[in-house]
Amino acid sequence: MTSVRTVSKIERLGSSLAALRRVALYLGVTIPLLPVQLVLIALHSPFARRLPRVYHRLCCSILGFDVAVTGTPSTVRPTLFVSNHVSYVDIIVLGEVIETSFIAKAEIARWPFFGWLAKLQRTEFVDRRGFRAAAHRDAIHRRLEAGDDLGLFPEGTSSDGNAVGPLKSALFSVAEDTVRGRRLTIQP
């Protein structure tokens, strides 16, 4: 015998109201922080590095994420944080744990709303076509020389996270660089 559970209208309404509440909280946090971050970037304030971490922490709280960290994130500046990319939630979760900007495909810069958020996090956008790889690698190196931590998903795409895909060597080669007179710190 098969059992089928019918979701009542009240349960659906409760779920919809909870989702609406989360969206309202998200917008209530995001909209006021946008101009603040814009000003911090314009003033070259060190807080322009810190505010995104506060923002991601608030987003994790709004979404109900309980983030557990195993190990200790590097505190050496600069650090290249390297990770598999499972979903866009990775940005929020990693952004809560580490004070970093990310390296992302150039198309994201043109996305409505989220492209703007990525720009305000000081994301380094890269064109995946090979002829621009050297220029992007140099831009990443300059950011590291300036002391910026960067997050890189070297597979260049998201996956289920169960296996490591082919690495996009042109950008990942920055890991071989000497930055500020020493080997670059890399943390998976």
Q: Over which residues does each language-model region extend?
A:
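Soluble catalytic domains of membrane acyltransferases
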Residues: 61-188
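A transmembrane-helix-recognition feature enriched in membrane-embedded lipid enzymes
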Residues: 5-68, 116-120
